[in-house]
Regions:
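Subset of outer-membrane beta-barrel
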Residues: 20-323
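NAD-dependent ADP-ribosyltransferases
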Residues: 1
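Sec-dependent N-terminal signal peptides
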Residues: 4-15
Length: 323
């Protein structure tokens, strides 16, 4: 019985952790993961990306997360208006019970220019998804073989919406700002019958700008604020981007920077853009009280994004801050 209670306590802690959505330190490596309205905020006709996160590597079985996403332009009209769709798949798991969640999401975004020049664009996005969380009871050691779990898997739907604004003041200054709400329907994620444990709504505000300070170097400040239930997160920092070569689809650049997750971690970022490819790397170092248990080891992230281009000038969007 004692062992059974210990396992249930572990699951309860997992549910509490699940009460906070999957998120990444690379806040804009693949922005549709953050806000469905960002679908379509790129140059080209489509985009494919993936991000992998390994968290708390100092423990025996660390928390691992993988996200894969794809986007494509459905329609583009006059004045840079258009419609874009996206699909995202998440998977994360950890622990000896292989507790994890798998989810799939479909999004659609419409973007409308606010002026004739197309230097100010408003985008609205909607997203729907389905998730399944569960664990492997065969990995549990029970003192009483007759004891068993009544619920091993929970399934639920997810709804999200967002709005984003892109603004280009001049050739060397542009920015984007977005707001999104996830888990609008607050699904029940409890493993216990006759119990309601809801996945709380997550509110996110994000801003990224790019200032061309020198001929080949830009400064990119960023701010991300998120709130979910009793939890809040504030990330702020800046990158420096060095344009090694600028020749249309053959653009080559390096980007490095630091960000701070307030009262929690320092995040080091490194990105390389080579033509249509973007390769990303980041590392979290704990600075909170958790650093005692984790040995200061936070999380490693690696990712890749590929942008599909058509070669036609008619399909080229205004130059957004690259991710």
């Amino acid at each position: 019985m004692k062992r059974w209670m210990t396992i249930w306590a572990t699951l309860l802690l997992a549910v509490v952790g699940q009460g906070q959505d999957i998120h990444f330190s690379q806040v804009d490596a693949d922005p549709v993961l953050l806000n469905p309205a960002y679908s379509g905020f790129y140059e080209g006709v489509g985009r494919f990306g993936m991000v992998y996160r390994n968290q708390w590597a100092s423990v025996s079985i660390p928390y691992q997360t993988l996200a894969v996403s794809g986007e494509m332009a459905l329609w583009r009209g006059a004045g840079r208006k258009g419609l874009s769709v996206g699909m995202t798949v998440f998977n994360d798991h950890a622990g000896t019970l292989h507790y994890g969640t798998t989810s799939g999401h479909l999004s659609i975004a419409y973007y409308q220019p606010l002026n004739r020049a197309g230097t100010s664009i408003l985008s609205v996005g909607l997203e729907g998804g389905f998730a399944q969380s569960g664990f492997d009871p065969s990995q549990a050691e029970m003192e009483d073989p007759s004891e068993s779990f009544t619920v091993q898997t929970v399934r639920y739907g997810l709804l999200a919406a967002g709005v984003a604004w892109y603004w280009q003041a001049m050739s060397d200054l542009h920015a984007k700002v977005g707001f999104s709400v996830r888990n609008i329907n607050r699904p029940n994620i409890s493993y216990m019958q006759l119990d309601d444990t809801h996945l709380e709504r997550r509110y996110s505000m994000f801003a990224r700008a790019e200032f061309r300070k020198w001929q080949s170097i830009s400064l990119l400040p960023v701010v991300l604020w998120q709130h979910q239930g009793k939890h809040s997160e504030l990330v702020y920092g800046a990158d420096l981007k060095w344009y090694i070569e600028e020749d249309g689809a053959r653009e080559v650049s390096l980007r490095a920077g630091l960000a701070f997750r307030h009262a929690d971690a320092i995040i080091a970022n490194l990105m390389m853009e080579y033509g249509a490819f973007l390769f990303t790397f980041s590392y979290d170092a704990n600075v909170s009280g958790l650093s005692v248990a984790s040995g200061g080891i936070g999380a490693f992230e690696g990712g890749m994004v590929y942008r599909f281009t058509s070669g036609s000038k008619k399909t080229k969007r205004i130059k957004c801050p690259q991710y």
